[in-house]
C-alpha cells in the first residue's frame, strides 16, 4: 500500500470531487443540448442587445468545434425560438478582460431582457469597475445581487440555473450564489434611460432564453456544453 503525503491526499481528493461533479454534469439524459451542430445555431434568432424585436445580422453568432462564439459585432442577443417556463439551464462561458455577457431568462420577444424579462449578468470585473453588486456576475441585473463572487476571470466558468415558479437557484463553479424567491422582489428598477422597469415579481413566468454579446474591443463571448432540461 502506497501512503500519500498530506498534500498528495488533498490533491487526490480534489481530483475525485472534480471527477464526480463532471460525471454528474454528463449523466442526466433528460437534458437537451442547445447547440448540437457546428454552423449557424438552429432554432435561434439574433437580435439587438436592447430590443429583442429588432433583428441583427445572423452571422453575429456561430458554432465551431462545439463552441458557440460571438463575432466582432458588439451588441447582440442570441435568443431561442422556443419558450420555457420551469427549467434547468447549464453551460460553460468564457470571457476576456473586457467581456460582458448575460443570460436572458423568461424574456418576451420585445424590449430589453434585463428589464422586460430577466437577465442573469455575466461580466468580467474589469468591464465596469463601478458596478453595483446586482450588476456583477450572477446577479439578476439591477434587481437581485448574488451572495458571493466566484467568477474566474478569463477561465471557463460553469453555470447551473434552475427556475421553478418564482424560485431561482444559481450555481457558479459549484458554489451556490443565488437561492431566492423572485416573488419577494417588489421594487421597480431603473432602465438605462432612467425610467422604471417592472419589479422582478411582475416579470413574465414564461419566455425565451438567450445569450448576450456586449464585450468591448471586439472580444468574443465563448459558450460550450450548453444544455437545458424542462421541469414538470
PLM segments and residue spans:
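Bacterial N-terminal signal peptides that target proteins for export
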Residues: 1-15
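Hydrophobic h-region of N-terminal signal peptides that target proteins for export
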Residues: 17-26
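Carbohydrate-interacting regions of secretory-pathway proteins
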Residues: 25-232
Amino acid at each position: 500500500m502506497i501512503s500519500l503525503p498530506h498534500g498528495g491526499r488533498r490533491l487526490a481528493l480534489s481530483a475525485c470531487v472534480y471527477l464526480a461533479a463532471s460525471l454528474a454534469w454528463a449523466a442526466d439524459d433528460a437534458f437537451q443540448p442547445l447547440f448540437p451542430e457546428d454552423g449557424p445555431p438552429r432554432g435561434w434568432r439574433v437580435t439587438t442587445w436592447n430590443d429583442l424585436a429588432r433583428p441583427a445580422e445572423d452571422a453575429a453568432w456561430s458554432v465551431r468545434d462545439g463552441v458557440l462564439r460571438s463575432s466582432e459585432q458588439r451588441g447582440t442577443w442570441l435568443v431561442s425560438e422556443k419558450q420555457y417556463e420551469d427549467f434547468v439551464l447549464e453551460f460553460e462561458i468564457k470571457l476576456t478582460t473586457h467581456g460582458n455577457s448575460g443570460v436572458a431568462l423568461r424574456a418576451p420577444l420585445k424590449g430589453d431582457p434585463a428589464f422586460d424579462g430577466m437577465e442573469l449578468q455575466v461580466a468580467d470585473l474589469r468591464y465596469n469597475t463601478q458596478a453595483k453588486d446586482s450588476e456583477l456576475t450572477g446577479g439578476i441585473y439591477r434587481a437581485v445581487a448574488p451572495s458571493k463572487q466566484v467568477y474566474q476571470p478569463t477561465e471557463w466558468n460553469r453555470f447551473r440555473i434552475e427556475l421553478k415558479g418564482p424560485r431561482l437557484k444559481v450555481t457558479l463553479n459549484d458554489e451556490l450564489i443565488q437561492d431566492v424567491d423572485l416573488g419577494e422582489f417588489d421594487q421597480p428598477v431603473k432602465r438605462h434611460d432612467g425610467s422604471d422597469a417592472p419589479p422582478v415579481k411582475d416579470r413574465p413566468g414564461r419566455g425565451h432564453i438567450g445569450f448576450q454579446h456586449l464585450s468591448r474591443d471586439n472580444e468574443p463571448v465563448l459558450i460550450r456544453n450548453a444544455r437545458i432540461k424542462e421541469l414538470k
